Amino acid sequence: MKVAVNGNPLIGLYAKVSEEYAVVGVNHEPLIDAIQEKLDVDVIVTKIAGSELVGAMMALNSRGAVVSDQVLSSELRELEKSLDVLVIETPMTCFGNNLLINDRGGIANPEMESSVVEKVADFMDIELVKGTVGGIKTVGMAAVVTNRGGLANPNINEWEAKKLQEVAGVEVLTGTVNFGTDMVGSGLVANSKGYVVGRDTTGFELGIVEEALFP
């Protein structure tokens, strides 16, 4: 399903999803309805650290959510109604940008402090290693992985792809969304049940998204 938020097709900036939940930073009915319908999740509507861009600000898997200590107490209360939440003090506050994870493992921005990587891995019960995707450090925007498959920036190299596939436990294909956007995490939200993409995604791109996420 294709959606835009007030004309913006970068829907991955506004939402973060797991197998059971989605956190959405804007009270935008078309996006919320699409996520509920296609991903079969309960939706939590809240900002993170005062920002609508929750896709950039938080990490999420079936174990729970990770946010920085910039999160507001009212936002934290909203999240904790449904999720276990780990709050970490770190200068690298955009966990959604800097972590690429599923329920098995993932990649962290190579500049993330090792102590933070360890805390996240322990809390989320995953194998987490530092790395890049297509040379990009903001790995959470450079690719999307679910428990079934993954779609990565077309510039990912063989070594990066092998590393990601090993830790996430899924095969990863390369592609774009939104008519050529290679930062696929900015325009795609997905779990093992379905996906929603930005409105500008072409039919050709959709075919690759389908093949990547549902092999």
From Swiss-Prot:
User: Quick check: keyword Transmembrane in the entry?
Assistant: no
SUPFAM superfamilies (UniProt xref): Pentein
Q: Which SMART domains match?
A: eIF6 (SM00654)
Q: What is the name of the protein in this document? A: Translation initiation factor 6
What are the recorded GO MF terms, alphabetically?
Answer: ribosome binding; translation initiation factor activity
The keyword Lipid metabolism is annotated on this UniProt entry: no
Give the family per the record.
Belongs to the eIF-6 family.
**A Pfam family matched by this chain, by name?**
eIF-6
Function of the protein:
Binds to the 50S ribosomal subunit and prevents its association with the 30S ribosomal subunit to form the 70S initiation complex.
InterPro entries assigned to the protein according to its UniProt record, in alphabetical order: eIF6
